[in-house]
Every structure is written in structure tokens, then in C-alpha cells.
Amino acid sequence: MKKIIILSISALFTQIAIAQKQELDSLKNIQLNQVVISGNKFAEKKKNIVQKIDVISQKEIAQMNAQNTADVLTNTGQVFVQKSQQGGGSPVIRGFEASRIQLNIDGIRMNNAIYRSGHLQNIITVDNNSIEQLEVLNGPASTIHGSDALGGVIVLKTKDPKFGKSKRLELTGANALMRYSTANQEKTGNIGIHLGTNKFASYTNITFSDFGDLVQGKNGVDSIMKLWKKPFIVARVNNTDTMLANTDPYKQVSTGYKQLDILQKFSFTPTKNIRHGVNIQYSNSSNIPRYDRLSETAAGIAKNATWYYGPQTRTLLAYQFDAFDLKGFFNDVTATLSHQFVNESRHNRGYKKAALNHRDEKINVLGYNVAFRHKDNKHELTIGTDGQLNNLKSTAFKEDIVTGLETKIDTRYPDGKNNMYLFGLFAQHTLKLDNGKVVINDGLRFNYNTLHSTLLDTSIQFQLPFSDLKQKNKSLTGNLGVAYMPSSDLRMTLNYSTGFRSPNFDDMTKVFESVSGQRLIVPNVNLKPEITQNFEAGFQYNDGKLELNAYGFYTLLKNAIVTDKFTFNGKDSAFYDGQLTAVYASQNKSKAFIYGGGISFIYRPMNHFSLSGSTNYTFGRYNSDSILIPLDHIPPVTGRLGIKYDHKKWYGEFYSIYNGKKGLIDYNPNGEDNIQYSTPSGTPSWFTVNFRAGFFVEKHTQMQLGVENILDKNYRYFASGMSAAGRNLIIAVRYNF
């Protein structure tokens, strides 16, 4: 009897061990054969791309339950995100931010000619509920993606329509979401519907979100919390601006906003190797208050009564043609024609001032890209061309809120014609040797960019000494890298790549008050393109049970565009908006460098359980008169730790996100680090403890629960003008089939 029991127990443990090994092997195979699209315009196994790519799946996005796409990136622990207002989120990749990284949606470049060098919120115009896969390509990627890809590229792939099995139109899939969060009284609803036949398919996705004012944490250092509380609000009382006490100083009044996102895609396959697609996207928001500007005071008196972004509108209409498994030299072809329209505006009024300033920017972007791929056992060759034409209309006026009188004021960008054209030819090659153990990536790109702006009224335009601005730039960029995989467990990489960024309207032509009454940025027509050289090494180990990744990089930046002191009409200061203000401008500095590295791991001690962690470090300086000065946008040490159970029926995770201290000595003195919103010693280090879980109540319906910042810590991300959320309870219901 004892032998039978012992044999039974032994057999049971053997089966468990076999099952565990099979699951771990399955996970390993999935990771090894993971497909990405950011590397060369076509679907490619991640292991064949030398450059570091972080991939976030649709399942991971759903489990995160993030309120927007910027928060998805924050939750990974791999990407730092800055916020000046709740309706924002500006990713930083390897010390580059805003116009120095590229956003790409469904193969279409989102960056336009007014992507600024400071902080952006454009990524939140992409609904994370519509994303199928998100990829972060780390380091210069100009060979394939062109200008602006200095720090990297964020590739957003939206969900494709699902085809049916017959000629009859049928429901082929659906998704829905309802979510409530307590820290900002978030109310989000989402619905998506797939309809299809065997040749035609449609996908419609609609999301609406209502975000209230964000409440910050109540636990922290008293002296810091005093700085970051909002003790007042500004209201009109008897037609006069009045400072009133904020009844809840932890509530960051004037941070709430609303947003609507719509995605509509059609797909048609007349034959098995031809596909036509139409992609329609629309995103719009309510007014988005600039909380950082509304919290500013001078001698205890509010500086601004009103400061908000108007509704941020983004539309995209694109046609895509794909042909695959073709006979002849080229096996695959993809081509896209697109039109994008973006409307942004800024509205501000000083405290107890009657003049409400309105500045509006409308930009239309026509674009195309065409790529051809050849594949054989050893070689893959992708060649192609892409281009964009940007047309900008910038207008401005001042409204007297008492009399209603409207008068012209200086526009943010030139008030005449503004055109920017980007053109590129590229080739990317992959060579596989020794049965795929050695993979070589090499590529080359030719860039040609032009910019032309005219000023119609130079008297209103801040009395600028010129009326016509022109620039033409050419460049060659490339990459060369090798991946060596001596076994299925081990992978080592070396990579060299160059990046290129041509100055846009925001760099060359804007008039902008960066810090109220302290710093005025004026145009500089003598800017040159920024050029980077990047050296990178990587190490990956994955035996199914332990996955370990480490990397290091060194980037040389030539002609780095930084904000520094300047003279305008021979003077170092000028009157702007009624105040004598120091003059600054974007300028090329001869040299800059950024280096850093990171390590991440996932350890799976048994089926369904995993321990994970990551940490990243970045350091950057530029040379000014033989003095090394900190570059702006360089985040502190960042990272994440987590323990997770993930079963097909339910999952649960405890995790912590942390940031190191950013001391004042490491702040850029003139750039976009927002030193005025930090503490006397800089940005303190912090960590949060968080929990999330989900379980299926039936096959297609999932309940989700989360508690973020369980300890209710009061903290702020580096360079951010508002504090992060305090303790936040999240309740959600999802439906998918």
C-alpha cells in the first residue's frame, strides 16, 4: 500500500513538473517568436531586430487598467512620463522627449511641424482601449522612421477588424468596458464591435471618459506637502477676480477634463494575398486646464486667473494597401496614403486682467509611405520611401472679458504661410548566418527636409526683424548591428545607429513665454539639424524560468538644440505681455552626450507565478563654453518591482513603482525641467505600493479591482507641474469575445 501511495505521489509530482516545464517552454517560445512591426515596416520576429524593443500586449494593457496611453507607459516601469496637467503625458526615452522621439500610429508618423521641445500630450489622443500592441523602439531609429527618432519611437498598433467565415455579414467580435476610479472620479465607458464576411470586415471602437479634479496623497513630508497643496482657487465674484480658499487643499482644482475617442477601420481582401484598408480616427477633448500655471503665485497673489488648452482635436484618414506572398523579387508590399488634422489652442488671462488671450493652431498633414520586402533563407531586404507635407495656420486675438472687444495680438507661430516638407529614401537589410545564430542588421536613409514661414504683420509679431524664413536640410543616417545567439537561452547584441532631427516651426519661429515674467523664448533662424550617434550593447538570457535583460548605451549629440540666453534687437530683455522679461532662444550647442543603462528580469518559480523587476538610469550633459551643463529631460533613476499570479481565469499582482531623487545640481537651469514646481532641494525620491486583480465571472465577462498608491503617498514626477494621484480605488467590468 505504501509503495502505491509513494508511486502515486511521485507520479503526481512528475506530472506537475512536466506540466510546469511545458508551460515555461511555451512561454519561452512565445517570447522568442514574438512579432514586432517597428523594426522594418513589416511583421518581423523580435529576435531578428538588434535594437532594443519593449512590447506591451493587448492583454497587458487591459490588466493595467490605465486611464490613458501615457499611463500605460508609466505602468511598465520602462518609460518615464512627465505631466504638467492631468490631460497630459509626455514620454521620455533615453533622455529625449517630445519632438525628439517619434510617435507612430498604424505605420503613420504622428509628429508634425509644431511638436514642441518641451512637454507634449499628443499620446493621450490615442485611445489605449483601441490598441492591439504597443512597441517602444529604444535609441535612434531614423533609418526606417526618419526625422525626430533621436531617443526612439513609440509604435501604436490599433486593433484590426475580424473577418467572418462566410459571405453573410455577421458579428465577429465585441469588447466593452465600464470603469470608475476614486482619485479623480474617473468614469470611462468603451464599446467595440467587429462585423465581417469572409472578404470584408469592419471594426468600430468608441470610448468616452470624464475625469474630475485629481486628489493628491495625504502622507508625506509636511514642508513638501505645503508647497504642493492648492490652498486657493480663483473665481469671478461681482465681476472681479477673487482668490477663495480651497476647501480641500489636497484636491488639485482645475485638473479635470473630458475626452472622446472614435476608431473606425474597414478591411477588404478580394484575394488571399491582397488587402485594402481604411483607417479613420477621431479624438477630441474638452478644455484642459494648465494646473501648473494656475497654481503660480507672486507675493502670495495668483499670477493667472485663466490658463487652459482648448479642445485638442486629432483626426486621421488613411488608406492602406498590402500585398504579400508575391511572386518575383519582392514578396511583400505595403503602401499608405494619409491625411491628419490637428487643432490646438492656448487661452490665458492674468489675475485681475481683462484681456483673455486666444492663440489657435491648425495643422494639416498629408503623408505617404511605400515599402517593399524581399525574403529568402538568409536575407531580408526592405526598401521604401516616405514623405509628409505640413501646412500650419496660426491665429491669435485678445478678448476684453468686460467689453467683449477683440483685438489682434502676436501669434505663437508666424501668421502667414507655414509649410514643412519631409522626404526620405531608405533601405534596411537583415542577414542571418549560422542557422540564425548570427543576425546582422544594416540600413541607410537619405533625408531631405524644407521649411518655409512668412510673417504678414511684423509690427504685431513682436516687431520681428524678418518676414521670411527658409531652411533646407539634407542628411544620411544609418545603422549597423549584430545579434549573436549561441544557444536558445542566450542572446547578445551590439548596435551602432545615427539619428537626425530637422528643426521645425516650434524650434525656429515661435514666440513663447516659458516661465511667466521670467523667460521669453524668441525665434532663431540660424538653427541647424540635431544629429546623434548611438552605441549600444545588450544581453538577454531566457531559459523559460528566468528571463534577464541588460543594456547600456552612449549617445553623442551634435548641434544639440537647447534653450539659452539670447539677445533680441541687441537687447537681453524685452517687454512681453506688459512685463520686462529676459530673452532666451533655442540654440545649437556644439556637443552633448547622454549615457545610461538598465536591467530587468522575470523569474517564474512555478506555474502562473512570476517575480519581475526593472531599473533604468540616464545621465546627460552639454558643453557650453567648456562647462558641462545638465541637459533637460533627463529623468532620475526609475524602476518597478512586482509579484504576480496569472491564470486564465484570474490574475492578481502586487507591484511598486519608484523614482530616485533628482537634485537641483542635475536640473537644467534654462530648459524644460520646471524647477519652479520642485522643492528647494529638487524632486524627492518616492515609491508607491499598488495592487490589481481580475477574474472572469463567465467566459467573456471579467471583473477588475485595483488600489493604486495604497500608502496614499504625496509625490510628484520629475519636471511635472502637478502631484500624482493619492490612494485610488479602481473598479471595472470588461466584456470580450
What are these regions (language model features)?
Residues 21, 253-259, 269-330, 341-363, ...:
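Flexible loop and strand-edge segments within Gram-negative outer membrane beta-barrel domains
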Residues 286, 341-345, 398-405, 448-461, ...:
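Surface-exposed extracellular loop regions of Gram-negative outer-membrane beta-barrel proteins
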Residues 381-491, 512-515, 626:
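Signature of Gram-negative outer-membrane beta-barrel scaffolds
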Residues 365-371, 422-424, 522-528, 534, ...:
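Outer membrane beta-barrel strand-and-loop segments of large Gram-negative receptors
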